Amino acid sequence: RPRPASLPPRPCEASTTEVPSRRGAARATSLVPMKLAELSEARLVSHFRESFPRGERTMIGIGDDCAQVAAPEGSFIVTTDVMVEDQHFHLSWSTGYEVGARVAAQNLADIDAMGGRPSALVASVVAPRDMDADVFLDVVRGLGDRAREVGAGVVGGDLSAGEKLVISITAFGYCPGPVVRRDGARPGDVVAVSGTLGYSYAGLDLLEGGYVDPSSRGVEQLGDLAPFIETYRAPRPPLGSGVAAAAAGARAMMDLSDGPATDAARIAKASGVVIEFDRDAIEAEASQLAPAARVCAVDPVRWVLQGGEEHGMIAVFPPDAQLPEGFRVVGGVRACRADEEPQAMMDGAVLRGAWDHFSADSVD
């Protein structure tokens, strides 16, 4: 996360609201003019069973003490992430559908970053009793739709009441080939990325700075700022690019959760090397952010290097590797010099990372 967003007041929520369709593009009148307190947990679980994708490998889904998911021979991989209202998202900026799609994407990208394919997700949700049920069920739809796109099931979870919306996802997957870790980078390798860089950070600055109306949607209302706002609200990482990178011989890889500066430093520290970004390549990425940079009057290079939450891949390849479609070279790997720590650099300077929840200086 680039940095903590400001905390706008929670929107007044009428008993009936307009919420986006399943794809979040159009707006339609709610069919559930109720608060969560008016619904039983059993009724919500029944809705989950009907709405969530079962998944291609699910043997037992929602309804038992555990789900059962078929696994190929070998190992499985598992990851978890949590999103907290007013820390990671604001319901005055994003729809429930976008929040659900976003939390799914960040977990699915972690599976992809290991060179894996997702099998199943479980979701634990804390929600306020006075939350509009239609907003809550839109979160369910966003989560389910994003999982369905990659053939993963949402096979269980837990519900509780609390002061704010909190969503914790655990994702399971398997690797069709060798697992790609963070610690395989070698001197002479090239560093490449997939997906957009800096779009989400630009969208955050546009919203936080009050440069756009938070209720605005689509190109019609947002113009050339739409890609940045939409990426912040619900990123669409190139899921599958991690599997392609693994097949192409990637030696180290991560999804871009916290931005290239931070995530490259993590690979460098794990591998005991220095990663150097190429200024021209970073400037080329930054040029795509020009519409937002003009509005916010900032250097978009900062967005590119420090912006996260887009969940494309940063991968390290042998110098003679044929890069998969969608990957662009942005730097290289060299050995540490005498008295030099493993780190990420550009123009001879150590790069400062992005936002950390507990310590602004921590990279792990």
Tell me the role of every PLM-derived stretch:
Residues 2-14, 18-20, 25-28, 32:
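Short amphipathic, helix-prone segments within low-complexity/disordered or flexible regions
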Residues 31-95, 114, 123, 142-146, ...:
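Extreme N-terminal cap/leader segments of soluble proteins
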Residues 36, 40, 235-236, 282-284, ...:
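Acidic, Ser/Thr/Pro-rich beta/coil linker or hinge segments at domain junctions
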Residues 60-61, 77-79, 153-157, 171, ...:
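General beta-strand structural signal in soluble alpha/beta enzymes
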Residues 71-73, 83, 118-212:
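Glycine-rich anion-binding loops of enzyme active sites
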Residues 96-120, 141-149, 238-244, 259-267:
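Small-aliphatic-rich amphipathic alpha-helix that forms the alpha element of a beta-alpha
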Residues 130, 211, 226-307:
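Active-site-proximal betaalpha loop/short-helix elements
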Residues 172-174, 314-318:
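Short hydrophobic/aromatic beta-strand micro-patches
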